[in-house]
Design a protein with these regions (language model features):
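Secretory targeting and sorting signals
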Residues: 1-24
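Active-site nucleophilic cysteine motif
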Residues: 189-195
Length: 217
């Protein structure tokens, strides 16, 4: 994957520098992303596998700057509407709100939080902070920190680097939470999108506020 990451970074640099590009056919998500200029496309290819394409909008239209990136999705595939515990990746267009990871900030335009053992993603459906990042000592947290309750401790290898997807922003209990683009461990996810860490870092350095992710079968 190192060569793919290098090519992705090179393509991003060329577009940033204003290199002329040929007009390309509009991608599948074009009518659903408003005025966004950066979109990560994820399309399922069967089971828990998908391909990711990275697009930049330029004066010549949408330009793919990273294509055919192998990705893992939920162990049970995708669904238009997901619920806690389904192990499915939500379909639709979502914001990319901020980034986090156990590693130091690799750079980029999104806010970044370096996480440790006191960082959690609250999945407790009875908690007023459901579907948000929380920082607390386990014994002092005001929500159920158990994995069986849906809460995740963020100090794990898969979250070496991650970007938060704006799924269920209304934080409706049961409608799912903790959906990220994160580093892969080589297998299906609980509903997130996972890719090679080096490639993810290249994408994170390119991302700016207003970027979107579009997910479809």
């Amino acid at each position: 994957m190192r060569r793919l990451s290098t090519l992705l970074c090179a393509a991003m640099l060329m577009l940033t520098a204003g290199t002329p590009a040929a007009h390309a056919a509009a991608p599948w998500f074009a009518s659903s992303v408003g005025a966004a200029t950066q979109v990560i496309s994820v399309v399922g290819v069967g089971g828990s596998s998908a391909k990711m394409d990275v697009y930049q909008r330029t004066g010549a239209g949408w330009q793919p700057i990273g294509a055919g990136i192998p990705a893992f999705i939920g162990a049970n595939g995708m669904a238009p509407q997901t619920h806690d515990g389904q192990m499915k990746t939500p379909m639709g267009v979502f914001t990319l709100d901020f980034a986090f990871g156990t590693e130091p900030n690799p750079g980029g335009g999104l806010p970044y939080v370096q996480v440790g053992p006191d960082h959690w993603w609250d999945g407790d459906m009875k908690s007023p902070t459901y579907n948000t990042m929380q920082v607390c000592k386990k014994e002092q947290c005001r929500f159920n920190t158990s994995l069986s309750a849906g809460t995740e401790n963020l100090d794990i290898p898969q979250y070496r680097h991650a970007v938060v997807m704006g799924v269920n922003k209304a934080r409706v209990p049961g409608n799912g939470g903790a959906f990220f683009v994160h580093s892969t461990d080589g297998g299906p996810t609980a509903g997130c999108v996972a890719i090679d860490d080096g490639t993810l870092v290249g994408i994170m350095r390119w991302l700016r506020p207003g970027a979107l992710i579009a997910i479809s079968k």
